[in-house]
């Protein structure tokens, strides 16, 4: 059938294009509406010390929209499995610097993919404590490990089944947030919502740093709008569906987050919300009592598990794309013989994520964002311009609105987020970058690739 053709060649041996528009939007929204908004609200408020920390969600939304347009243009132009791996390779030259950039991206994935999955799993385990007696940190970490393994098992199946499951999980996640919003709308108090401490808006480094920290948490909450780009080889009509899925998912989630935070800060004093470890459950307990808080907690845990599901689904396609291209270990190019999904890549990243479950949640989030900015995000913003100027052979069915303004705004906001994290975390990100460059140069020297030579038949 035309809707289920293989994405590579006509042999039927490649990935299956089994995701339509509905499933594409679902794959993004499910990842974005994970545990993030439920566990990061207190961290967001603490970053600026008051309800004006809502600016973090607004700044995060602006950054997501501008960066989302970068993803939409690149995703529509090069809709193969692997996302950024393909974009960086083609933009910087497939037999020149593109080899280094695409290698660095795959190198980064072996840090950011497990880090991303671990944030959802650790958040799940921490939030689950609302339902029972307090447990030790070690027990919490092992609950997170168990979730990683369970999700890996759940993903060990064909893409059409996963697409339908993603849509169901999206409905659960959206329903959970809508219940919170509707429950609180009639109870919002303006005096709580605008209880902003005196002197909060002073244009000092402290304010800028706090705003950058709030934006970092905000963009973490929006993370996932690019998920469908990593599944580009499995999307039907990708030149249309990928840009639409990116933009629609950001719009849906931005509205939900802004209403969610307005509702919570209008019902709970911001000091109480900042101190809560289960802020949404505490909110529902204020409105309805403990029964509603417990029901909501189960729904939050379901949304969290759904996010981990979507994260691991998207990331597992990246080592596959690199290995199939001959740029990574060939074992990762293997597909399941019957259901045709990258089983080796999936299992490897699923197991690797269990290691990061033993780190602190805040440290995981910061490390994740910084490594992504340094290696992937900045290189990809430049990639849009490089393709427009030097690769007229690449068809661009979707073009960024108002180019180059969105890409420049995204660049400035990402740099603001980067400098607000502090020298230690940025230094660790640069260390990961340096190690990746060193590994690439060693490999390139051994096999005679750029910059030491050209592959046979290369330009």
Region spans (language model):
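Select transmembrane alpha-helical segments in multipass membrane proteins
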Residues: 18-28, 54, 62, 94-110, ...
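Membrane-interface "cap" regions at the ends of multi-pass membrane proteins
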Residues: 1-51, 65, 69, 96, ...
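C-terminal membrane-solvent junction of multi-pass transporters and transport-like membrane proteins
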Residues: 165, 331-341, 377-426, 446-457
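Membrane-interface loop-to-helix entry segments
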Residues: 139-194, 205, 223, 246-250, ...
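TM-loop-TM module centered on a large, flexible mid-protein loop between adjacent transmembrane helices
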Residues: 86-94, 129-134, 200-202, 245-312, ...
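Helix-loop-helix junctions that connect adjacent transmembrane segments
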Residues: 10-15, 54, 135-139, 168-297
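Hydrophobic transmembrane alpha-helices that form the core helical bundles
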Residues: 43, 56, 65-148, 153-156, ...
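Hydrophobic alpha-helical segments of multi-pass membrane transport proteins
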Residues: 176-180, 319, 368-396, 433-452
């Amino acid at each position: 059938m035309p809707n289920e053709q293989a994405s590579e060649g006509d042999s039927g041996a490649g990935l299956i294009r089994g995701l339509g528009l509905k499933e594409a939007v679902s794959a993004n929204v499910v990842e974005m509406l994970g545990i993030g908004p439920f566990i990061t609200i207190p961290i967001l408020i603490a970053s600026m010390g008051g309800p004006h920390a809502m600016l973090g969600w607004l700044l995060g939304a602006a950054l997501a929209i501008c960066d989302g347009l970068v993803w939409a243009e690149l995703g529509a132009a090069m809709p193969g499995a692997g996302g950024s791996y393909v974009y960086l390779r083609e933009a910087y030259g497939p037999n020149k610097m593109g080899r280094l950039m695409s290698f660095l991206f795959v190198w980064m994935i072996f840090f950011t993919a497990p880090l991303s999955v671990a944030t959802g799993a650790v958040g799940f385990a921490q939030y689950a404590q609302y339902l029972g007696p307090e447990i030790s940190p070690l027990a919490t970490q092992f609950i997170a490990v168990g979730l990683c393994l369970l999700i890996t098992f759940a993903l060990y199946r064909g893409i059409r089944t996963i697409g339908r499951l993603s849509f169901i999980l999206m409905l659960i996640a959206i329903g959970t947030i809508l219940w919170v919003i509707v429950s609180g709308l009639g109870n919002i108090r303006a005096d709580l919502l605008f209880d902003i401490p005196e002197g909060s808006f002073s244009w000092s480094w402290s304010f800028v740093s706090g705003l950058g920290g709030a934006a970092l948490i905000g963009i973490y909450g929006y993370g996932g709008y690019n998920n469908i780009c990593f599944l580009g080889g499995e999307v039907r009509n990708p030149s249309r569906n990928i840009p639409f899925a990116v933009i629609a998912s950001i719009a849906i989630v931005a509205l939900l987050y802004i209403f969610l935070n307005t509702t919570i800060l209008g019902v709970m004093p911001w000091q109480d919300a900042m101190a809560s470890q289960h802020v949404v459950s505490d909110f529902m307990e204020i409105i309805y009592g403990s029964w509603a808080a417990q029901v909501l907690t189960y729904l939050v845990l379901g949304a969290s598990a759904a996010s981990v599901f979507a994260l691991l689904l998207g990331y597992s396609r990246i080592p596959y794309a690199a290995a199939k291209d001959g740029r990574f270990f060939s074992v990762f190019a293997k597909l399941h013989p019957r259901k045709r999904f990258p089983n080796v890549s999936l299992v490897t990243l699923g197991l690797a994520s269990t290691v990061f479950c033993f780190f602190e949640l805040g440290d995981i989030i910061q490390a994740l964002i910084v490594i992504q900015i340094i290696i992937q995000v900045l290189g990809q913003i430049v990639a849009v311009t490089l393709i427009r100027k030097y690769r007229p052979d690449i068809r661009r069915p979707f073009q960024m609105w108002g180019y180059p303004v969105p890409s420049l705004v995204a660049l400035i906001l990402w740099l603001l987020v980067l400098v607000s994290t502090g020298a230690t975390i940025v230094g660790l990100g640069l260390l990961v970058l340096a190690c990746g460059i060193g590994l690439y140069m060693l490999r390139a020297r051994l096999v005679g690739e750029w910059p030491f030579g050209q592959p046979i038949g290369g330009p």
